[in-house]
């Protein structure tokens, strides 16, 4: 099991969203923040053997509702979760960035630093959220591919 730190920023984040600071919640945040890719519930289940599936589902659900994490789907349709930027609010996600799906390792990356084009919707349309996907090879898989 990976090393997990109980970080004060996670306690502050839970306080900010009026959530109890439970061990499983703090561990989920720590595990998710330690990765540079989005994480699926099955991946978290494999790391957190002492937390049952229903509890983990509820943690992910409340974190998404509160704007702590956002959901992104991989190429297989599996929901993955990543920590939101600090400007997300309850029921109002601001994580409008490119999500990159690697076609080899199946990891999902949030590419937050890219400038996205503005989208002008036709009259009468109102976007409530926005998701942009790209797929291909991540740097690690691309490097392996080039060595062949």
Q: Across the structure, where does each feature detected by a protein language model lie?
A:
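Short, Lys/Arg-enriched N-terminal segment that forms or immediately precedes the first helix
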Residues: 4-18
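Short helix-capping/hinge SLiMs at alpha-helix to coil transitions
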Residues: 19, 33-36
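Short helix-coil-helix linker/hinge
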Residues: 19-25
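Pre-recognition alpha-helix immediately N-terminal to the DNA-recognition helix
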Residues: 26-31
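Short coil turns linking two alpha-helices in DNA-binding domains
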Residues: 51-52
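Basic amphipathic alpha-helical segments that dock to polyanions
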Residues: 56, 60-66
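Non-DNA-binding regulatory cores of transcription-related proteins
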Residues: 66, 70-148
């Amino acid at each position: 099991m990976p090393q997990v730190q109980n970080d004060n920023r996670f306690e502050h984040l839970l306080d900010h969203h009026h959530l109890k600071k439970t061990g499983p919640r703090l561990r989920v945040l720590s595990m998710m923040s330690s990765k540079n890719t989005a994480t699926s519930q099955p991946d978290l289940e494999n790391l957190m053997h002492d937390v049952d599936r229903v509890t983990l589902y509820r943690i992910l659900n409340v974190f998404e509702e509160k704007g702590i994490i956002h959901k992104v789907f991989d190429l297989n349709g599996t929901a993955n979760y990543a920590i939101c930027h600090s400007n997300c609010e309850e029921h109002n996600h601001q994580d409008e960035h490119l999500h990159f799906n690697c076609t080899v390792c199946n990891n999902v990356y949030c590419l937050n630093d890219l400038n996205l084009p503005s989208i002008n919707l036709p009259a009468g349309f109102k976007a409530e959220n926005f998701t942009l996907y790209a797929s291909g090879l991540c740097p690690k898989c691309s490097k392996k591919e080039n060595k062949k």
